From Swiss-Prot:
Catalytic function, reaction form: 5-[(5-phospho-1-deoxy-D-ribulos-1-ylimino)methylamino]-1-(5-phospho-beta-D-ribosyl)imidazole-4-carboxamide + L-glutamine = D-erythro-1-(imidazol-4-yl)glycerol 3-phosphate + 5-amino-1-(5-phospho-beta-D-ribosyl)imidazole-4-carboxamide + L-glutamate + H(+); L-glutamine + H2O = L-glutamate + NH4(+)
EC number: 4.3.2.10, 3.5.1.2
Cited SUPFAM superfamilies: Class I glutamine amidotransferase-like (SSF52317)
Pfam family, one: GATase
Job description of the protein: IGPS catalyzes the conversion of PRFAR and glutamine to IGP, AICAR and glutamate. The HisH subunit catalyzes the hydrolysis of glutamine to glutamate and ammonia as part of the synthesis of IGP and AICAR. The resulting ammonia molecule is channeled to the active site of HisF.
This protein's name: Imidazole glycerol phosphate synthase subunit HisH
Keyword Transferase annotated: no
Native species: Chloroflexus aurantiacus (strain ATCC 29366 / DSM 635 / J-10-fl)
Record pathway: Amino-acid biosynthesis; L-histidine biosynthesis; L-histidine from 5-phospho-alpha-D-ribose 1-diphosphate: step 5/9
Assembly: Heterodimer of HisH and HisF.
Keyword Acetylation: no
């Protein structure tokens, strides 16, 4: 059972429908104990990191997620669900995040063009991750859909599985052990987005979490 975290994110229904379309067995929950015992966890998100962190803390989810990820529970963060994994965010002032992935959430550079980036852009998959299960049947250069003004400046470049250019080459996918996170919206990314979600479902089914 995949736990899809419900903390009020606007893209939650679309993420749920996309996961159901690829055959996922899931529950939508804001219960920390359900999240703790899940076979896999998906954290969707749109909006500001500070607001998201406030909701996660209020629900008691912020305290559970580090332990869930440390237990090797397969995890997928989407958009802001990726950004809150970092140490801190510069969005609307400096705010602390979950500090699971060392790094800072920073604004896209003004010379990139229109901010936020809204629309299709390419994944440049790192050769190191080319054969990772998450990228099965997804070619290098695949177009996926972005809506964001901030990006994840991660401290460890070895976890950057794919980059995308928008003024700068920013991490669009990170993978560390059984944690994956994407800056784009797979639920809006057509066939390639559905493939990534299907790949995550298969990947999560093959992993046995250690238990929290």
């Amino acid at each position: 059972m995949i736990a899809v975290i419900n903390y009020g994110a606007g893209n939650l229904p679309n993420v749920v429908r996309a996961l159901q379309r690829v055959g996922a067995t899931l529950t939508v929950t804001d219960n920390p104990e359900v999240i703790r015992s899940a076979q896999a966890v998906v954290l969707p998100g749109v909006g500001a990191t500070a607001d998201t962190m406030a909701s996660l803390r209020h629900l008691g989810i912020a305290e559970v997620l580090p332990a869930v990820i440390a237990a090797s529970t397969p995890f997928l963060g989407i958009c802001v669900g990726m950004q809150v994994l970092l140490s801190e965010s510069e969005e609307f002032g400096l705010h602390s995040c979950l500090d699971i992935i060392p790094g800072t959430v920073r604004r896209l550079p003004e010379h990139a063009g229109k901010i936020p980036q809204i629309g299709w852009n390419q994944l440049q998959i790192s050769p190191t991750f080319r054969n990772h299960p998450l990228f099965a049947d997804i070619p290098d250069g695949a177009d996926v859909y972005f809506v964001h003004s901030y990006y994840c400046a991660v401290a460890d470049e070895a976890i950057i599985a794919a980059r995308t250019d928008y003024g700068i080459p920013f991490p669009s996918v990170i993978i560390r052990d059984h944690l994956a996170a994407v800056q784009f919206h797979p639920e809006k990314s057509g066939d390639y987005g559905l493939r990534l979600l299907a790949n995550f479902v298969r990947w999560s089914e093959a992993v046995q979490p250690k238990g929290v």
